[in-house]
Each structure stands twice: as structure tokens, then as C-alpha cells.
């Protein structure tokens, strides 16, 4: 277990608090997150062919992902309200898996990182794909939501060992 004196969120009595970021310097920050929505054969085909009753699945999911990133501090306890300067959400059809790969890129100039915003964008976009396709099948799996890379801040740049793409290249 971590030494309680080194943790940033517990208060002296062991309760929780939001970390004070007021002494940190503004810096450029980016984050890339990814995930996958396994749809199965019919739903995958119908999304590709724009044949879902609710409408354009990927455009709706893209908007939802961007909206999710902007609401992260309202959804995640103790998450700072980051100044988001840009959010991109995009999709790739994964034929082998009959899945849609979801990627989000977030950008900010501020005192806190935007990793949680990128992860939230992927999660909300994925949930939206589920919602729009559930009339075709309920056997939809959302998975592998993870941070691929981040830049900036006190901890510097980081890239997942399982990824070969940096935020600038994503």
C-alpha cells in the first residue's frame, strides 16, 4: 500500500479532496486514448452501409465523444475542469474483429492533463455506438479502452508499451 503522506487526494483525516493544482505551470498537453466496440456480423455490416434506424451511427458517436470529453469533470469525482483546446474522435472499421476501433485525441494548454478527457471521449463514443445498434443485437461488447499516449505536464511524455504511435502521429 502507498504511503498515505505521498498520496495527492486524501486529506489529513483520510477523506478525499481535489488535488490543489494552483501552483502548477501551464503547459501544452495532449492525450490519445483508444477502445474497441465488437458489433458482430449484422450490426457491423449495417453500420458500414448506414442502415441503422436511429441514423448515422459514427457521426452521432463522434459528437457524443466530444461532448463526453467536455463533461469529464462532471462525471469523474475529483477530476479537474481542464481547459480543452481540441478534441478529435475518429473510427476505423476492423473487418477481422467485426468491430469499430475508436480513437480520441485531446489537446490543452493548462495545469492539468487531458488523459481522462480522452478516455471519457472513447467511452462515451463507444456507448453511443452500442445505444444506436442495440436494436440490431444486444450482443455488443465494448472493450480495451486505454490510454495510448500523453505529452506534457510534470510527468512528461508517455507512450503505452503496446502502442507504436505517439500523440503527434495519431
Swiss-Prot record:
EC main group? lyase
Q: Which domain of life is it from?
A: Bacteria
Q: Which PANTHER family match?
A: MOLYBDOPTERIN COFACTOR SYNTHESIS PROTEIN A
- Where's the active site on this chain? 131
Gene Ontology terms, MF aspect: cyclic pyranopterin monophosphate synthase activity
InterPro entries in UniProt: MoaC, MoaC_bact/euk, MoaC_sf, MoCo_biosynth_MoaA/MoaC, Mopterin_CF_biosynth-C_dom
Q: State the EC number(s).
A: 4.6.1.17
SUPFAM superfamilies listed in its UniProt record: Molybdenum cofactor biosynthesis protein C, MoaC
Alphabetically list the UniProt keywords: Lyase, Molybdenum cofactor biosynthesis
| Protein name from the UniProt record | Cyclic pyranopterin monophosphate synthase
**Renumbered residue ranges of the record's region Disordered:** 1-25
Q: Which CDD domains match?
A: MoaC_PE
Known partners and oligomeric status? Homohexamer; trimer of dimers.
Name the source organism.
Answer: Salinibacter ruber (strain DSM 13855 / M31)
Q: Does the keyword Phosphoprotein apply?
A: no
GO BP terms: Mo-molybdopterin cofactor biosynthetic process
Residue numbers binding substrate: 78-80, 116-117
What is the role of this chain?
Catalyzes the conversion of (8S)-3',8-cyclo-7,8-dihydroguanosine 5'-triphosphate to cyclic pyranopterin monophosphate (cPMP).
Q: In which pathway does it act?
A: Cofactor biosynthesis; molybdopterin biosynthesis
Please state the gene responsible for encoding this protein.
moaC
